[in-house]
Swiss-Prot record:
Biased composition (Pro residues): 75-85
Regions recorded as binding DNA: 159-225
BP GO terms, sorted: defense response to bacterium; negative regulation of DNA-templated transcription; nitric oxide mediated signal transduction; response to gibberellin
UniProt cross-references to InterPro entries, sorted A to Z: WRKY_dom, WRKY_dom_sf, WRKY_plant
Annotated Low complexity bias: 133-142
Lineage, uppermost ranks: Eukaryota, Viridiplantae, Streptophyta, Embryophyta, Tracheophyta
Biased segments, Polar residues type: 228-242
Name of the protein described by the UniProt record: Probable WRKY transcription factor 27
Keyword terms of this UniProt record: DNA-binding, Nucleus, Transcription, Transcription regulation
Amino acid sequence: MSSEDWDLFAVVRSCSSSVSTTNSCAGHEDDIGNCKQQQDPPPPPLFQASSSCNELQDSCKPFLPVTTTTTTTWSPPPLLPPPKASSPSPNILLKQEQVLLESQDQKPPLSVRVFPPSTSSSVFVFRGQRDQLLQQQSQPPLRSRKRKNQQKRTICHVTQENLSSDLWAWRKYGQKPIKGSPYPRNYYRCSSSKGCLARKQVERSNLDPNIFIVTYTGEHTHPRPTHRNSLAGSTRNKSQPVNPVPKPDTSPLSDTVKEEIHLSPTTPLKGNDDVQETNGDEDMVGQEVNMEEEEEEEEVEEDDEEEEDDDDVDDLLIPNLAVRDRDDLFFAGSFPSWSAGSAGDGGG
């Protein structure tokens, strides 16, 4: 019984102890909350804390150095909206292109060099073209054409009769062969004035020998002559020849007169004086002929330079030797001299 009582008592006691513990715990929790409320006063408001700080600062002002405080306010710049990737602004694209072009212009060229040319403007030359440019600069300049393209040219086809009826005075100064034609080409210049630039070329047609092809170059700088000399087309006017001395008479009467002349001591010998004058005239004529030959040779050389590229043939100007020889033959004969005859008569 006692054990059962104990067991029942233990059960009742255990139940009563659990209920008391729960009540005590709940009461204990209420006591703890009340204690916390009593021990922790509510926090003071913010303005009171700030006022206490101000009071502390005011109390410490006499002991602190005087300082001035400035407050600056910083405001962030307004944020620009980012450009849309799908449709960029044309102004932005234009600025980007300008920046790229400026950066490319600032870069020095790598394969380009500048050489000072002969002219005032600068030339950009690549490395491969440097040798070619130096070769071109080292070559001598081509000889300029003398009045080649500046004078007008007139070509006429005339017959023999019309060729001889030319009213201008011409002088032939040379000729040269023509490629593909058996007839040579004759060159004439105006003989009326020394400074006249008029020229004439005469050649016989290869198709019709009765037709002459006449090419006039340049213009006359003087009026047309009133009369034309018969030798104007071939050579210049030479000085008039000295009249030949007539041959002495071989009659017996003339021999007697000669003896009287030679025997007279007071009579001067006029025959020797005439012979000396004749020899002096021959020397003067020979000098004039030599001077004219030199002038013709110089003119042939000048005209050879002017006509060097006509018809793509070799320029070989042949001077007018035939006419010159004909004129020289006129003075080739020596005049008769009386000195030998006079000496023979005097000795007899």
